């Protein structure tokens, strides 16, 4: 007797300016061809047109209809569900939930699953037999983060870098950014702003420091820097060997742009703190915390407290000395290039999705379920 087909329900993303999709039209077709049933919600913010899904044979349903969908559907999305919703979750969910690393409010996020006998397969923790993530947005997170870093540095060169309040001319923060249709358009815009800044400052390129340079995210940041023409000598590429001695690091203070791309898996000494930054001779004016462990008690960049958003991409670090310093801590940076990031991610995820009919025995899914059970058990204790 053959198994019933896996039924996936692609929910519409609700996070503001989240234009990515967990399934693309091309990966939807692959799954349909493999015998899956797929429902796709209409979405007001997806980079993909609903007609693209319809054309490959998906069933189109209204936005938000997953809440009343039959229990046998697996609800598939990317970002977390809205915080103001608290009803129990009855389905199996595949998504990034951000509740396994003691983030603020993790219990409230996680408890909804056992309350409804639902299951969470967290995309961040789908790992192969070697312990590596099967799919990640890291490359485009680093790429987009570096782009915003250069835009912010250029903005400061052009508009002055004195401290002030938002919107008061000099001292204002970087204006909002919106998703780009493709990588080339983003590169073009960043190059234009960089060239203006170089004209103003006598052709001095920024000194950039990337921590986590050997990973997906760091390689994305370095790729952006190279594609817009920043000389290789101006890009310091740090990884675990360089940070082994423990921070804070004066080398960050002496750079113009600092990009943090590490994956935080355990407590480490901070890379920087307000004491080392509060210096008249500081060069650093732009931090991009791609890792965005904003609410993690072990955040290695403990100089800001909010996650920024695309329409207000930076927040000022309050310091008494030195030039103005801003942090970008957007936690869904790949949305700046939603189509390419979605295709890249979905392609990597495809072999694991094709294993969903065997999720009770397939190692990737079994490990994800065991991790879910482990953290649910913590709910009772904490």
UniProtKB/Swiss-Prot annotation:
Binding site for NAD(+): 132, 215-216, 239, 243, 263, 290, 330-333
Key words, A-Z: Amino-acid biosynthesis, Disulfide bond, Lysine biosynthesis, NAD, Oxidoreductase
Gene3D superfamilies: NAD(P)-binding Rossmann-like Domain
Gene Ontology MF annotations: saccharopine dehydrogenase (NAD+, L-lysine-forming) activity; saccharopine dehydrogenase activity
Group of enzyme by EC: oxidoreductase
Catalyzed chemical reaction(s): L-saccharopine + NAD(+) + H2O = L-lysine + 2-oxoglutarate + NADH + H(+)
Residues binding L-saccharopine, per UniProt: 20, 79, 103, 133, 137, 291-293
S-S bridge residues: 217-261
Pathway participation: Amino-acid biosynthesis; L-lysine biosynthesis via AAA pathway; L-lysine from L-alpha-aminoadipate (fungal route): step 3/3
GO biological process: lysine biosynthetic process via aminoadipic acid
E.C. code: 1.5.1.7
CC terms in the record's Gene Ontology section: cytoplasm
Residue numbers annotated as active site: 79, 98
Record-stated family: Belongs to the AlaDH/PNT family.
Subunit-level organization: Monomer.
Record's function text: Catalyzes the NAD(+)-dependent cleavage of saccharopine to L-lysine and 2-oxoglutarate, the final step in the alpha-aminoadipate (AAA) pathway for lysin biosynthesis.
Matching PANTHER family: SACCHAROPINE DEHYDROGENASE, SACCHAROPINE DEHYDROGENASE [NAD(+), L-LYSINE-FORMING]
Name this protein carries in UniProt: Saccharopine dehydrogenase [NAD(+), L-lysine-forming]
Organism whose genome encodes this protein: Candida albicans (strain SC5314 / ATCC MYA-2876)
Encoding gene per record: LYS1
